[in-house]
Design a protein with these regions (language model features):
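Class I SAM-dependent methyltransferase SAM/SAH-binding core
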Residues: 158-160, 165-214
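A short SAM/SAH-binding and catalytic strip from SAM-dependent methyltransferases
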Residues: 223-236
Length: 333
């Protein structure tokens, strides 16, 4: 019985503290150990009990294990909601528990600061090469404004930001989205994204590690899928586009921000670009083939490179066909 396992899981002061911390943000097990002042193996045992009870969930990101409050459909109501209210009341009424939670939050603030410092140091190391590339592009603020306008007036709903990188696009769209999932293959980039997003409500966003050619989500999981400056890293862009189509619900949308076709060969060498931009005709063909109805693209000239914004609506009754096609291709392989 789950009620029994939940009550057992909460019958420990450390696990109560962990649950209060997770109400504020997702934390690595090592970060929890740092906040709680306990060894990592000991904290891991507490984490296992909370996860077994269904109160918390683990998520692997490279060699790190992150913990968050359970985000199942039932977590906003019933037993999970009752637990949240109980912990809030306990902190209000129990002075000793309240003092301990306040101390934990002070340590949590140090974790936030450390994440932001790590992000700043990373950008400082790569600033010169990124500045050279940015100098060729249309200003970021102009591109972001064009993306926001291209997505209006339809609600964003559940958003998947594929190749989230630093998390800037997830941050930009979070206010208008019901929930944001930022996906990236790089643990380093996910740490940068976490530093950027950590001040948003913890139930508003999550991060996931994965590849854009094999998205770790079920069909029709999202209302909006964004690929911002991602597809030029794909040797065969139709593969990530097929995956984006699979996870986008009928009636949803895909938004692609990328470079127009160009001939700057140095981007292959310095920045690992597999494709030197794209033509409108390429995207018209790819998006149509994957069940989208493209709108007219937006063109944003820069100082040597042109940025394009392509938005397309997902046509109905294509998800099942795409799933069958994907399964058939796996069998053939």
């Amino acid at each position: 019985m789950r009620t029994e396992s939940v009550i057992r899981a909460l019958a420990d002061p450390t696990r109560l503290r962990i649950m209060r911390l997770l109400a504020h943000m997702e934390l690595a097990v090592g970060e929890l150990a740092q906040v709680l002042g306990q060894s990592q193996p000991r904290v891991s045992r507490h984490v296992a009990i909370l996860c077994d009870s269904g109160l918390a969930e683990r998520r692997r990101e490279g060699s790190w294990i992150f913990l968050r409050q359970a985000v199942s459909a039932a977590s906003a109501r019933g037993l999970d909601a009752a637990v949240a209210r109980l912990l809030e009341t306990a902190e209000e009424e129990d002075q000793a528990f309240s003092a301990r939670c306040a101390e934990d939050r002070r340590h949590l603030a140090a974790i936030r600061t450390a994440r932001e410092k790590h992000a700043s140091e990373y950008f400082a190391r790569h600033a010169e090469e990124w500045d050279r590339l940015r100098a060729l592009l249309s200003p970021a603020a102009r591109v972001e404004d064009a993306l926001l306008k291209a997505l209006e007036p339809q609600p964003i709903g559940r958003l998947l930001d594929v190749g989230t990188g630093t998390g800037r696009i997830a941050e930009l769209l979070a206010e208008r989205a019901e929930h944001v999932v930022g996906l990236d293959r790089s643990p380093e980039m996910l740490r940068l994204a976490r530093a950027r997003l950590q001040n948003l409500p913890s139930d508003k966003w999550e991060l996931a590690q994965g590849d854009f050619s094999a998205l770790p989500f079920p069909p029709a999981s999202f209302d909006t899928v964004v690929l911002h400056q991602v597809l030029h890293y794909a040797t065969e862009p139709s593969f990530p586009l097929a995956e984006a189509a699979r996870v986008c619900r009928p009636g949803g949308r895909i938004a692609i921000v990328d470079l127009a076709a160009h001939e700057r060969e140095e981007l292959r060498q310095r920045h690992a670009h597999a494709r030197l931009g794209f033509t409108d005709e390429q995207f018209l063909e790819w998006l149509t083939a994957h069940g989208f109805a493209p709108a007219a693209p937006v063109t944003l000239p820069g100082h040597g490179l042109t940025t394009k914004v392509w938005v397309a609506n997902r046509l109905p009754d294509r998800t099942a066909e795409l799933v069958r096609t994907r399964k058939a291709s796996h069998v053939a392989a």
